[in-house]
Amino acid sequence: MENLALVTWTHDSYDDIFPVYFGNIEKFFPSLSKSYVLINEINDSISDNHLQLINDENVSYVSRWLGCLDHIEEEYILYMQEDFVLYDHVEEDKINNCLEFLKSSDCSCVRLIRSGLNSLDDKVESNIYKISHFKDPNLSFTHQPTIWKKDHFIKIMEILSPQSIRDVE
């Protein structure tokens, strides 16, 4: 999975779930080559397999994201949160299919979980459906496991300019 980084948004107050979350990533996604943790302060319970990028809680949510993304060199990011716990092995061929789709399309992202808010009328590839966000652009970003083109993620964050995490829920 060349050029893909796992990016976990979290907070040190959720450290009770870290052993399960990060342990399951290492167990069920061993081929993952790069993992970043966007967190408010260094947490010793997170292994060195995951590079911790510290964000300042005193600035806006968008600024925290953009500041951390400056340190991520990969072109694609897999957005996660600490409560998106893996419970089985990652089907890497499907992740690779999603990456190939993103590389060859103008789509910004591929959500890895279906939302009940969108119909599945526009199938563009096996198990990939195009969703229009024109009805409600605030749904361009959702807190779901999603593979993003990093540059598109940055544009969405700049457009939405959320001041807090609640502004994009």
Regions of interest found by a model, annotated:
Residues 1-76:
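N-terminal anchoring/stem segment of glycosyltransferases
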Residues 15-18, 43-47, 86-89, 94, ...:
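Short catalytic/ligand-binding loop motif for oxyanion handling, primarily in non-cytosolic enzymes
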Residues 75-85:
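Short beta-strand-to-loop acidic/aromatic patch adjacent to the donor-nucleotide binding site
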Residues 140-169:
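Catalytic core and acceptor-binding pocket of nucleotide-sugar-dependent glycosyltransferases
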